[in-house]
């Protein structure tokens, strides 16, 4: 009985929900199928009842209070600000809340009145005591400057070839931005939190306000509403922290390779410079370590850790043990966030080649399509292809992008900015790879070569188009006239004839087409053997009477065609004179000179001289 029932197969469509939401947003902007009109301070907002009821409990109660026929079309709301309602509507259709330090209070009040709890929680976390807006604005400006530099570097590499190192820097820079949705909430510290906070309170004053208990940067539970928070559970492997580490350090054990020397005296001789907000300060404020119970597993043999380096760098750091650090899911993301670029404010710079070697090369698997993503910061970017999230929007044409650097490049179309200038001809370009392709015109470099015909190209897409056509793999005839050696050989021998070094003549093409009507006379020409003379066979011979008859037929056809053309035109003496002139023209007879010289000395072809005299008389 169970075998008769077909097994149900569930086929998921991850992008369906986001596509439906995007379609509803387009309908809202175009005013299509909108069944409710919200009026706030003489500003009208057309929207859909179902979307509002799904996001707000207030609208759900309002729209389900009576029958649909009794509900009005226009609702006037006087308890919210227009900017706050516009931001909430944008959140309802795009799942992205755009707020500023000035309108966060208005959005909080509107979310409370409309009963949207998730927006209320986010606004309360942003307005936490100690998180003043001035400090956030300063950090936002600094981070934007860093983003501009890093995005310029990334743009140069991603269009020509995808570089995992640039993707890691881009993801880390996006994490540095003080997004209001990424600011963690304040929770009551646990017993282990007091231990770590006490340890951080004894650290040197080089890192002020970063490790003090009760500050916004104290260690607590990570809570954010970005896409990364959806991926943390059962995604990052738990990091096994060695028990031998005597002090708390945010660095992974494998951060320093085995090939590094153990003596770091050269770094310790550099003078210490005070930092207003170092990279570690920013990391610990925005990314906080949540402590859990440590799994009782035998730790692997630890690699050598340069403790002497930290002793020289932090001479005032107390050497007492601070307690074991518990492993957790978020610790892997915390370690992947660190890179040599972000630690540049703390440690002296080293060569770029070694810096690239130190960057983490983590591999993560997509939980939806199970594709292995190489690079620490590429998985959240890959997840946006499934969720359809596009958090960056153009303020002019309202086109959305998944990445901030793509939005910056798109804005150049509106501003007309062309930052890349050619030093030879002063040509300007929007993209750096366009400048590289243009520079090859001046340098003559063709780096892309076909492996079949060895033809070189200046651009990779030209090579791909050439290979796709497969024009270099197939044999094709030459265009235009054949070389002189080929024409001479074709006059002497046929396709299956002997080699060109043997003396023989073959019938020209004009004579070969009308051949096969040999009369009584035969023409014999010198050749390799008597059996291969072309007039020895009946098919290749031609009589003199047939040649004269064909010449007369050609003259009559040309004369009749000229008369028809003269009658078709607007007649007159001029048209008749032109027709007579055309009729009197001698037709071309394709008989080359070598044949005339070769046939003149033969007694059986004396009639050909009569044909030549007739053509001369016509001239």
Curated annotation (Swiss-Prot):
InterPro entries: ARM-type_fold, BTB/POZ_dom, SKP1/BTB/POZ_sf, Znf_C2H2_sf, Znf_C2H2_type, ZnFinger_BTB_dom_contain. One of its GO terms (molecular function) is zinc ion binding. Keywords: Metal-binding, Repeat, Tumor suppressor, Zinc, Zinc-finger. Residues 133-173 have a biased composition (Acidic residues). A zinc finger (C2H2-type) spans 364-386, 392-414, 420-442, 448-478. Residues 129-218 are annotated as: Disordered. Detected in normal cervical keratinocytes, and in some cervical carcinoma cell lines. Pfam families: BTB, zf-C2H2. The keyword Metal-binding applies. Disulfide bonds: none annotated. SMART domains: BTB (SM00225), ZnF_C2H2 (SM00355). Residues 191-208 have a biased composition (Basic and acidic residues). Residues 34-101 form the BTB domain. GO terms for cellular component: nucleus. One of its GO terms (biological process) is negative regulation of cell population proliferation. May be a tumor suppressor gene. This is Zinc finger and BTB domain-containing protein 7C. It comes from Homo sapiens (Human). The gene is ZBTB7C.
């Amino acid at each position: 009985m169970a075998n008769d029932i077909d097994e149900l197969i569930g086929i998921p469509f991850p992008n369906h929900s986001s596509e439906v939401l995007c379609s509803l947003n387009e309908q809202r902007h175009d005013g299509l199928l909108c069944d409710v009109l919200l009026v706030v301070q003489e500003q009208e907002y057309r929207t859909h009842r179902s979307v509002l009821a799904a996001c707000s409990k207030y609208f759900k109660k309002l729209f389900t209070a009576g029958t649909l026929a009794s509900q009005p079309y226009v609702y006037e709301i006087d308890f919210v600000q227009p900017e706050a309602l516009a931001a909430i509507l944008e959140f309802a259709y795009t799942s992205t809340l755009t707020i500023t330090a000035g309108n966060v209070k208005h959005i909080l009040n509107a979310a409370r009145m409309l009963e949207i709890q998730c927006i209320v929680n986010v606004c309360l976390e942003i307005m936490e005591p100690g998180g003043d807006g001035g400090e956030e604005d300063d950090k936002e400006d600094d981070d934007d400057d860093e983003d501009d530099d890093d995005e310029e570097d990334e743009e140069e590499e991603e269009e020509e070839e995808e570089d995992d190192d640039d993707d890691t820097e881009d993801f880390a820079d996006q994490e540095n931005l003080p997004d209001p949705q990424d600011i963690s909430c304040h929770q009551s510290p646990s017993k282990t939190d007091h231990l770590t906070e006490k340890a951080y309170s004894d650290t040197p004053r080089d890192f002020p306000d970063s490790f003090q208990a009760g500050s916004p940067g104290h260690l607590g539970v990570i809570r954010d509403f970005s896409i990364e928070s959806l991926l943390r559970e059962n995604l990052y492997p738990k990091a096994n922290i060695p028990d031998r580490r005597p002090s708390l350090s945010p660095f992974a054990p494998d951060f320093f390779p085995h090939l590094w020397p153990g003596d770091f005296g050269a770094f310790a001789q550099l003078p210490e410079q005070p930092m207003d907000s170092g990279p570690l300060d920013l990391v610990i404020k925005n990314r906080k370590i949540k402590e859990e119970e440590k799994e009782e597993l035998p730790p692997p043999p630890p690699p050598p850790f340069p403790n002497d380096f930290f002793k020289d760098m932090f001479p005032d750091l107390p050497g007492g043990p601070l307690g074991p650090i518990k492993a957790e899911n978020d610790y892997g993301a915390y370690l992947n966030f660190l890179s040599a670029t972000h630690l540049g404010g703390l440690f002296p710079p080293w060569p770029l080649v070694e810096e690239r070697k130190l960057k983490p090369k983590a591999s993560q698997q997509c939980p939806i399509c199970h594709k292995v993503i190489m690079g620490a910061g590429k998985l959240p970017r890959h997840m946006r292809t499934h969720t359809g999230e596009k958090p960056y929007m153009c303020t002019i044409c309202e086109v959305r992008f998944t990445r901030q650097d793509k939005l910056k490049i798109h804005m150049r179309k509106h501003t007309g900015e062309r930052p890349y200038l050619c030093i030879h001809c002063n040509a300007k370009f929007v993209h750096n790879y366009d400048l590289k392709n243009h520079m090859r015109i001046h340098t003559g470099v063709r780096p892309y070569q076909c492996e079949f015909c060895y033809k070189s190209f200046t651009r990779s897409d030209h090579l791909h188009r050439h290979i796709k056509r497969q024009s270099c793999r197939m044999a094709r005839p030459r265009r235009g006239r054949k070389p002189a050696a080929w024409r001479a050989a074709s006059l002497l021998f046929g396709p299956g004839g002997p080699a060109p070094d043997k003396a023989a003549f073959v019938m020209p093409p004009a004579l070969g087409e009308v051949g096969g009507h040999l009369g009584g006379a035969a023409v014999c020409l010198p050749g390799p053997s008597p059996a291969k003379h072309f007039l020895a066979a009946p098919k290749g011979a031609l009589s003199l009477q047939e040649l004269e008859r064909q010449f007369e037929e050609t003259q009559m056809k040309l004369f009749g065609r000229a008369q028809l053309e003269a009658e078709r035109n607007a007649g007159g003496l001029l048209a008749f004179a032109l027709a007579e002139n055309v009729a009197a023209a001698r037709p071309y007879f394709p008989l080359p000179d070598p044949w005339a010289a070769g046939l003149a000395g033969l007694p059986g072809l004396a009639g050909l001289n009569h044909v030549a005299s007739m053509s001369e008389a016509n001239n």
